Design a protein with these regions (language model features):
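Structural recognition of the conserved hydrophobic beta-strand(s) that form the central parallel beta-sheet
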Residues: 7-9, 40-47
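Conserved P-loop NTPase "ATPase switch" module shared by AAA+ and STAND
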Residues: 1-17
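C-terminal regions of RecA-like/P-loop NTPase motor modules
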Residues: 1-6, 30-39, 51-155
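Short, ordered loop/turn segments at secondary-structure junctions
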Residues: 11, 47-48, 81-82
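Flexible beta-alpha connector loops of hexameric P-loop NTPases
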Residues: 14-25, 52-61
C-alpha cells in the first residue's frame, strides 16, 4: 500500500507484561526484522521509568522495560517537557504576574537524540508549544501550521 512509516503507540499496549523482558526483546526483534525486510521506518513509543521528579530529563538508560529496547533500536529519541515552566506559567497566570525571564525564554520542550546508529548526530532540538495548532515549532516566533480543523462536539 506504499506505507513506509509505522508508529506503535505504545509498547505498553502491545499485550506484553511489564516484567516480561524476554517478550519485550522478542517483540522489538520482530519489529527490527520487519523494518529490514520491507525497508520501512518504525517508531516505537515507550515510557520512561519513574525518576526522582518530573523536572529532570530522562535518557536511553531510563527506558522502561527490557534493556534490549534501547540496545536494538537504530535511533533513540527522548522528549523532555519543561514541566517547571508549565507550572510557573499556570501559577503566574493565576496570580496575574509575569513569569521569571529565565523560564519565560526557556523552551517548552527539548527533543534529544540519545542514540544514532546511522551517523554521529546525537544532539538536541529546542521546541516551543503552540496551543492553537496543538504542535511544537522550532522557535517561539515560528508560525505553526494548521493541518486540519477539528470540530469539538458540544461547542
Amino acid at each position: 500500500y506504499g506505507v513506509d512509516v509505522f508508529v506503535v503507540d505504545s509498547l505498553l499496549k502491545c499485550g506484553i507484561a511489564d516484567d516480561d523482558y524476554s517478550g519485550q526483546k522478542a517483540f522489538v526483534e520482530a519489529l527490527c526484522d520487519f523494518k529490514n525486510q520491507f525497508g520501512v521506518t518504525i517508531f516505537l513509543v515507550t515510557h520512561s521509568r519513574k525518576g526522582d521528579n518530573e523536572f529532570q530529563r530522562t535518557g536511553k538508560m531510563d527506558v522502561r522495560g527490557a534493556g534490549a529496547i534501547s540496545d536494538l533500536c537504530d535511533t533513540l529519541l527522548t522528549i523532555f517537557r519543561n514541566k517547571k515552566k508549565e507550572a510557573e506559567k499556570s501559577r503566574a497566570q493565576a496570580m496575574h504576574e509575569d513569569m521569571p525571564p529565565d523560564l519565560k525564554n526557556a523552551p517548552d520542550a527539548i527533543l534529544y537524540c540519545d542514540k544514532q546508529r546511522n551517523g554521529s548526530w546525537e544532539l538536541q532540538a529546542t521546541l516551543w508549544w503552540h496551543d492553537g495548532a496543538n504542535q511544537y515549532t522550532q522557535n517561539e516566533l515560528q508560525e505553526a501550521e494548521i493541518y486540519s480543523q477539528m470540530r469539538v462536539v458540544g461547542q
